Amino acid sequence: MPASPAAQLPAASLLQLIWLASPALPVGGFSYSEGLETAVERAGVTTEVLAGDWLRDQLHLSLARGDLAVIAQAIPAWRVGDVQRIRELNDWVLQTRETSEMRAQAEQMGRSLLDWLRNHDGANAQHITACAQMQPTYPVAFALAASQTAAGVRDCLLAYAFGWAENAMQAALKSVPLGQSAGQRMLARLASDIPTAVEAAISLPDDERQAFSPMLAILSSQHETQYSRLFRS
């Protein structure tokens, strides 16, 4: 049944979220595999099924309990101008990046998105200045961009998670390697799981937000000295 007009996301906000989730956004997300490249080499992630399982675990065990939860809390904080709350969330992201590659990714993508926002019509200059002063991470910068739309938190998280899934799928295609049809099947699996991950993230209070993924940290550390690699993480 079609949604009522009152329940529909305004077209402008929908397009803004699609834009933010697009792999074409110049933030460099395509250049990171987030440990998957090393998992292919060292942990036997060598098939479509295994790669899909790996990404699904990343979605539920890492993204939903960490970055998505941060964004869910940061969007309303940006909308009311609670810079201290934003700073606390940004510090948490920095503190939970367990390797140099993970931290470099969060910082580089955050800076790039903030640079994009500076040249974006309708950007809040005061918020951009506040964000720039705190060594912004990507989740916090994304929350700033999303907060300037009329979209609800849930829709913003769905966009972020799908953008992550597209980049992760592309990393799997290049690392394993796999074909385009396999990639679309993997993306379909992730898309069906994203709403559940988003609901879990929205429900998390501060003391239950976490980023404990020891094997991922080990693989990320190993990636720093991996002899042959395509990705920056």
Curated annotation (Swiss-Prot):
Keywords: Chaperone, Cytoplasm, Nickel insertion. This is Urease accessory protein UreF. Its main location: cytoplasm. UreD, UreF and UreG form a complex that acts as a GTP-hydrolysis-dependent molecular chaperone, activating the urease apoprotein by helping to assemble the nickel containing metallocenter of UreC. The UreE protein probably delivers the nickel. The keyword Nucleotide-binding does not apply. The keyword Transcription regulation does not apply. GO terms for cellular component: cytoplasm. Signal peptide: none annotated. Pfam families: UreF. InterPro entries: UreF, UreF_sf. It is found in: Cytoplasm. PANTHER family: UREASE ACCESSORY PROTEIN F (PTHR33620:SF1). Required for maturation of urease via the functional incorporation of the urease nickel metallocenter. It comes from Polaromonas sp. (strain JS666 / ATCC BAA-500). Disulfide bonds: none annotated. It comes from the Bacteria. Belongs to the UreF family. GO terms for molecular function: nickel cation binding.
